[in-house]
Amino acid sequence: GGPGGGYSWLQEHLGSGYLAAWHVPENKDAAVVNSGVSRWHNFYVEGLDWLVKHEKIDGLYIDDVAFDRTTMKRVRKVLDRGNPGAMIDLHSANQYNPRDGFASSANLYLEHFPFLNRLWFGEYFDYDSASDYWLVEVSGIPFGLMGEMLEKGGNPWRGMTMGMTARLPWSGDPAPLWKVWDGFGIQQSRMLGWWSGEAPVTTGDSAILATTWRRPGKAMVSLGSWRDADTKVTLRIDWKALGLDPARTRLRAPAIDQFQVAGSWGPGD
């Protein structure tokens, strides 16, 4: 049961005894909240199977999850069986509020993470929070997932230390940053995050963090500051871990629109 309400069609045809879901009036969305375990999920999974086979869909965008882990496993199997490589993308607004029972989105959906490919967390997330909040509650990295930013465009400098950008075209234009990633060959590199305990580049400042992407003969370093004011740091570089000779290496910052100006330094500058 429930208080009813919601879209006009529901009120006209169902009367009462149901729980209306979040909906978009312009799209005539007569959505209702169902139980987390329901025979409707059989209908949902069979529908996905039909779409994979006949429409060749290559993944799902899920805006919060209304079913259990068992159903998610079935969804994953249907996608993998019909279109290997299909992706599942989970979006969630921050559920840590009185209306949603102060539930961290990462904690709320943790049981689904093994079957997902990426996260988009999301409206109302606080990108001014500490780095450990970013890592655990936003990035997806501890769980083997990638993430993207949304609320007010996120923070591109902090986000890059975790491989995150805003999602085109919702908040800003990350294309200039993507171009630099592609030019470096980020897909062929090994990511050594500031949290890993083996970061070859550090700053000596616990609030200014560095993540390194290492390839044979070159490396890319991202710096993210959690300081409230401009701060100068000197990079501490483990040249042996990078496989680079400091006598033959320069540090270059390419110009990236709305991100940074160009610069060039020698080791020790």
Task: Give the ranges of each region predicted by the language model.
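Short, solvent-exposed coil/turn linker segments
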Residues: 29-30, 34, 236-238, 266
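Active-site-proximal substrate-binding groove within the catalytic cores of carbohydrate-active enzymes
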Residues: 73-255
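Active-site-adjacent "subsite" loops/lids of carbohydrate-active enzymes
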Residues: 1-55
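Catalytic core of carbohydrate-active enzymes
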Residues: 255-262
